A protein has these predicted regions:
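Short, small-residue-biased leader/transition segments that mark boundaries at the very start
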Residues: 1-9
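Short, structured active-site "lid" loops
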Residues: 23-37, 62
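Glycine-rich phosphate-binding loop and adjoining beta1-alpha1-beta2 segment
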Residues: 11-28
Length: 284
């Protein structure tokens, strides 16, 4: 295929822990390869649509743009506008579908290519690609895998659209679900849940905002945990044991989980057993 590209990118955004403003990776790559970059500040006053018309595109490809395109813009390209979404639509429309798939303990997720429509993530499906979620896979690790899957699926989608062989299947809106953006209010671990729910919270909130727990009066970020076969009569959230294997915490119905990696305030991320060598934690 003989393809050429123009890029529309979001403006400068905070992209590190210091909230330093920088270009998006897409814009950086485009500039490095002398690909024209456009950054419309408004989408609904007609100027952005006129810009797209002037470019006379065959197709619009939208990935993680963060803004809904107006209907008149979607009608400009010969082949329409398509999107890559990191879930198996119509499940998990909206923000953070990857994280919520992990948080909810899903075993299967994937990516979807679809045509854009007036409402968010409601357009006709072109292709989907599935993958299993690892039991101890973080959202960040899953993101990296889905990113590659999405790129491969997008390549197939574009080639088949050009060839006229791409399918178009309306979504079953009765099966739709929506997920919200993450925030730090989700971080405190809810110990009065099953061990699997606790572990999925820990792995689902990485790399951000990260699960937290208060242990012996101090708040820790929790990065890794394991299942145990132990039972306890202690209340959820109680420290059952703390030693060479890690820190064992009571959950729902007397079951426990073992925290194996954490980070104390002002300290580096480390194994729980290493932290305990210099900072004993009281058993409840």
């Amino acid at each position: 295929c003989d393809w050429s590209s123009d890029v529309c990118s979001s403006d400068l955004e905070p992209r590190d822990r210091g909230m330093k403003l920088s270009y998006s990776p897409v814009k950086e790559l485009a500039l490095e390869n002398n690909i024209p970059v456009y950054q419309p500040t408004k989408l609904r006053d007609g100027t952005a649509t006129e810009l797209i018309k002037s470019l006379d595109p065959d197709i619009l490809v939208v990935v993680a743009y963060g803004r809904i395109l107006p209907d008149d813009m979607l009608e400009v390209p010969k082949y329409g506008a398509i999107n890559v979404h990191a879930s198996l639509l119509p499940k998990y429309r909206g923000a953070a579908p990857i994280q919520w798939a992990v948080l909810n303990g899903d075993k299967i997720t994937g990516v979807t290519t679809m045509y854009l429509a007036s409402e968010m993530d409601t357009g006709d499906i072109i292709y989907t690609s599935e993958t299993e979620i690892g039991e101890f896979e973080t959202s960040g690790e899953l993101f990296d895998r889905l990113m590659i899957m999405g790129a491969e699926l997008l390549d197939r989608t574009l080639r088949d659209i050009e060839a006229g062989t791409a399918p178009r299947t309306p979504q079953d809106h009765s099966k739709a679900s929506y997920v919200k953006m993450l925030d730090k209010s989700l971080s405190p671990i809810e110990w009065a849940k099953t061990p699997r729910e606790v572990i999925k919270q820990i792995y689902g909130l990485q790399p951000w905002p990260v699960a937290t727990a208060e242990l012996d009066g101090k708040v820790f970020k929790i990065y890794s945990a394991e299942y145990t076969q132990n039972k306890t009569d202690k209340a959820p959230g109680s420290v059952v044991s703390a030693g060479k294997k890690g820190i064992e915490i009571a959950c729902l119905d007397g079951e426990t989980v073992l925290i194996t990696e954490l980070q104390a305030a002002g300290k580096k991320r480390m194994k729980a057993s290493d932290y305990l060598l210099g900072h004993p934690i009281k058993v409840d």
